Amino acid sequence: MIIMALNCGSSSVKYQLFDWDKKVVVAKGMVERVIVGDSYIVHEVPGRDNYKLEQDCPDHRAAIDLVIRTVTDRECGVLQSVAEISAVGHRVVHGGEKFTCSVRIDDDVLNAVKDVQHLAPLHNPPNIEGIEAARALMPAIPHVAIFDTAFHQTMPEHAFLYPVPYDWYENHGVRRYGFHGTSHLYVSKRAAMLLGKPAEQCNIITMHIGNGVSHCAIKGGVSVDTTMGLTPLEGAVMGTRSGDIDPAIPAFMMQKENLSAKEIDSVLNKKSGILGITGRYTDRRDVIEHAAKGDHRCQLALDIEAYRLKKYIGAYMAAIGKLDAVVFTAGVGEMGAAIREKAIEGLEHIGIHLDRERNAGAMTRKRESLITTDDSPVKVYVIPTDEELVFTEDVVAILNGTYTDHMQFEYSFAKPDFVRT
């Protein structure tokens, strides 16, 4: 059984083909610069040289058509025909309150996703375009939607509601939704496995740190709070996003610099965070390198990021009670030993005893690592995320009629005999 995972961004289409029977990725890749011009595909097959082809893709349909032609190409492909694909899983960033789990896509589901696209105007429209294009190009194949927000639909009202006029929530859906749900789900299940306890008996803080950053408080195996809010802008310091700031700052700066609402939104989403502080960098490797050379603003960016990480660990520990583990994941979380160290050093009083040697050695995206001492009351793990595996398992279970929701479904990666491929 071959499952295709699609992730359609504003100017890109990521894809992966997973052989469910053999439990291996058979191909993956990305079409970049969709719509904007000079588009190209990079196609990766294990054991082969990467394949790159430049081809104009004026829209997502053209990009997905290029993906299909590439994966079925006689020379660089891995399939004889698109009919070998059993189903397609689509990442959808925002499902609003309607979608609490992954669902098979029909016209009603697609219309419901369109109804909430105003909540994610940068992300849902390309997701929708990708779904429409893929359904048109592969009409005989089942399509499934996997929502970034679904994992967080277990949050209680006191965690997801903002202290603003209640009719904003009733009339416009203004509340905390949270994102990166599939990543938080995967690493929390793996952490429970490493702890040797059922997920429903674990209290875990998961820290997804890439260019986008979100943290999640998981109590008894379910999300009870998360840092991102109505949009992915709230919360931790990110590569280009500000995260938490005084809500009065946008209006203040709009007046001071005569900025429109659209312009201030762009500044907070695309010109703030690590980039805003350093003035030059979003890649933490560049920031760490130049901080070591004495660049004050790079050092300041690292200090601010680590300080905010530490604050959220403390806040979420207070919210969920006795803490079993903290998990770092995603690009920076998995590879940024220096940032991890700054975030968790000095937390011995709350039961976190960092092993600096272990932390320094956990610089790979292929291995799960414990970075605290053996006797640390709270364990800290580095766990490479695998959102595509969550996509695949949800799709297969929906096809087989065995899927209920992410809380009750027994994922293969939550079992003792799981081996990461």
Curated annotation (Swiss-Prot):
It catalyses: acetate + ATP = acetyl phosphate + ADP. Mg(2+) binds at N7, E387. One of its GO terms (cellular component) is cytoplasm. The keyword Transmembrane helix does not apply. InterPro entries: Ac/propionate_kinase (IPR004372), Aliphatic_acid_kin_short-chain (IPR000890), Aliphatic_acid_kinase_CS (IPR023865), ATPase_NBD (IPR043129). ATP binds at K14, H208, I209, G210, N211, G212, D283, R284, R285. CDD domains: ASKHA_NBD_AcK_PK. The keyword S-adenosyl-L-methionine does not apply. It is an enzyme of class 2 (transferase). GO terms for molecular function: acetate kinase activity; ATP binding; magnesium ion binding. Its main location: cytoplasm. Keywords: ATP-binding, Cytoplasm, Kinase, Magnesium, Metal-binding, Nucleotide-binding, Transferase. It is found in: Cytoplasm. Substrate binds at R91. Gene3D superfamilies: 3.30.420.40. GO terms for biological process: acetate metabolic process; acetyl-CoA biosynthetic process. The active site is at D148 (proton donor/acceptor). Its EC number is 2.7.2.1. Its cofactor is Mg(2+); Mn(2+). Mg(2+). Can also accept Mn(2+). Homodimer. Catalyzes the formation of acetyl phosphate from acetate and ATP. Can also catalyze the reverse reaction. Belongs to the acetokinase family. This is Acetate kinase.
